[in-house]
Amino acid sequence: ITKNYFNAVSNQFLPMHSAACEPIDNILSNSTGPVNALVAFVPGSEKDLIGMVTADWGNGMDINEVSESLQFGSRHTDEGPLCIHGVGLNNFLLVATRNKYPWFIATKKPEEDSYHLVDGPFDTKMKIVEQQDIPLADIVMRDAYKPLGAPSTIIYVEMDKSTASTMLTQNGSCAPSKVSSLNVLRRSIAEHFGVKYRNYLKPDDSGAAPARILIPDYQMANGKTCDVFVKPIFQRYKAVTGTQHLSVNYNGHDIPVSVEVGLLNAAATQTRAVTGGYALKHYYQGNMSTQGVDIQLGDRVIATAQLDTIWDRARHPSFNLFTGTIAIDISDLPRGFLNTLANKSNIDLSDEGWRAIFDAVKDAVPVVEDKTCPLEEYAKQFAERIMNNTGNKVKLQFPVYANRTRIDVLEYIDENHCNIYDFMSTAANMKSVAELRTHWDGMVSQGCQPVSATMFTTSRGPMLSHTCEELNSLIQSMPDDKMKAALKVAKGDVAKLPHYNLEIVVDKNLPR
């Protein structure tokens, strides 16, 4: 292994909200009894760098174990289904820091007096030093955990805003300008962890949960700042089928699978669901991108919004409220029997075991469709009014970018110009503006110039109008050849080039 290898691994596609699960998975697997974890975001050592701290009060590692855990040629341990201290840990360290920013691991067994500390970046040879003082004591020694004494393991990484911003989306797209404060990251990671670790964070009948994840200095929705424990997030239903129990035989093993599906109660699920009283941003939005079921491996949610990977159905607005959980009991399965992608960021569809499970689910459990589909009907009536008032040709659910997204209502003004209309039954946010722009760019690429793009919604934030104004001051995206032709027509006057014309409109008549 050379230094070039470390750089290559650091550039893999792994959003930070998935990479950051690795320390938590390690903590869950390397603890005896109740799990106590901490995740903090602090200013980095330089401007525009952000520090992320994880700590736990579990079993820790001795000097041999920490040395082994950082060896790229070594495999993870077999302790538990989440495994510990393997390639995933190194993935996290490299992806977070891009192998150019500081990191360290300090760990010890509970009975040891000093920490075994390793500083990054990675090199072919690295030193382990001993340290008796608790690293970052002012951050990790919070009042809630002081009775537990010193942490067993502390991991610190620094990242730039581009990397940090991949926590703020589901697909890992990069938008460093969105990292406006550390609390944006705290709120986002609370949502991701609240979904992925909900079964660990859910209190039992006595009020105690198997695991706690503390986030220090968290700004609540009411403006108060305090240390808080991550809240588990479960979808809530307005209609649900009974749980079906399947036994899937594959490769000599009977795999117990439980399936629950139904229709999402979007308003009840989203309202104050995230730690601190915030609404959901990434999950259970009641739209096409979040429709589908969660995949649960043991107690860990490893994938959400699964639809066409299981059923032979394309995403469609009538499935916007379709949700549920496929839970796989892995207690009697060998370690690694069902493969996942790096850091359990998703299912590995090349593993035939998953195909066997999904085929069994598809045969036994139908997709639940919202037959009323009130928003789609509302859009249909809107389209009819356009045709009656203007005589223009209108298309519903128009596919853009080879069916990767759809426009609710597309009005053809003539052969070369159109108006775009989209509808949503929940509050509009920055994603709504991004969706409008995606639809605009898609029509441009398909040879039809939009004149306007409007999103009708039940409510919107105060800054969305300003965001639209900023975008509307920009020249639209287009290929170089089209830009060259447009400049020629405009005789070099950029003011005459096609600009965006996006608008978010509140329509109180929209069905909710």
Indicate residue ranges for each PLM-predicted region.
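Bergerat-fold GHKL ATPase/HATPase_c domain
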Residues: 1-43, 47, 64-70, 338, ...
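Acidic ATP/Mg2+-coordinating residue in the GHKL
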Residues: 56
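Glycine-rich G1-box
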Residues: 59-60
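Bergerat-fold ATP-binding/catalytic subdomain of histidine kinases
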Residues: 68-81
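GHKL-type ATPase core
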Residues: 80-218
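Nucleic-acid nuclease catalytic cores
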Residues: 99-114, 424-425, 441-488
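Charged regulatory segments coupled to nucleotide-binding catalytic modules in large multidomain enzymes
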Residues: 239-381, 385, 389, 403
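Active-site metal-binding core of divalent-cation-utilizing nuclease and nuclease-like domains
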Residues: 308, 387-415, 427-430
